[in-house]
């Protein structure tokens, strides 16, 4: 495997594993420097790159597929992992370092996957590692929020898994756009599973409940990946699905109204995530080239400015 087709997600997962076992004196340089290799790997990926791996029953896993859409999301995810790694250098919690990097690597795994099996594997790994990021705060509130987060994402993950099972059973192994139909059971199961991750109203309560309960580092990683990976999946699979316009508008208005009424800075920013993701979802629903480019650009910039806001709001009250 050359640098030109090295999976950046694998690099970040390796960083997490290293951080889990090395002493703190070595963990800091690992978190600060090694994620930059992932960023370098993204920069060397050429459009059209497609790495595969043989699987059971003649199935081929397309675990590294690069086009313009996957590349831009992979770029911002690696940038965020590198920035977050530098910020996390002060942290003595090795489990948080492991989960944050594995979480980011899993997000890249979903982004660069071209087949359903790879997508669901990394999606579930994202859910597991993000759960432990919430629990890393080790407070009663974070434990309770984590259990609720677990229940919601188990439900959403099972919906997504059931939809993917139907697609794979029908011989459809590759991730393809579904907006043009048929709007069958698999369509609705996959759409609902991804919508939960995108915090589409009324499936959004887990975000406002869980994100404020994480550590500062954990909250920044949480805000950067789960909903944005879901937006990527919506663009990839459901672009032009009309009803997403109305859900996006509802999210934008609902999140903004509740953010105005909040006096807890973390909860305010969590509602603001719902609102801003609503604009992205509405763009996906419109489905035009300009709307999809706008949703992608908004996701890119939102990760950057939201992380800055969360880095500067460690206190529980504004």
List the model feature ranges, each with a label.
Residues 12-15, 63, 72, 104, ...:
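Bulky hydrophobic/aromatic packing residues
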Residues 1-98, 172-173, 177:
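Transmembrane helix-loop-helix hairpins at membrane boundaries of multipass inner-membrane proteins
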Residues 83-94, 101-119, 128-313:
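Hydrophobic transmembrane alpha-helices and their helix-loop junctions in integral membrane proteins
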Residues 314-318:
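A short, hydrophobic C-terminal helix/tail in secreted or cell-surface proteins
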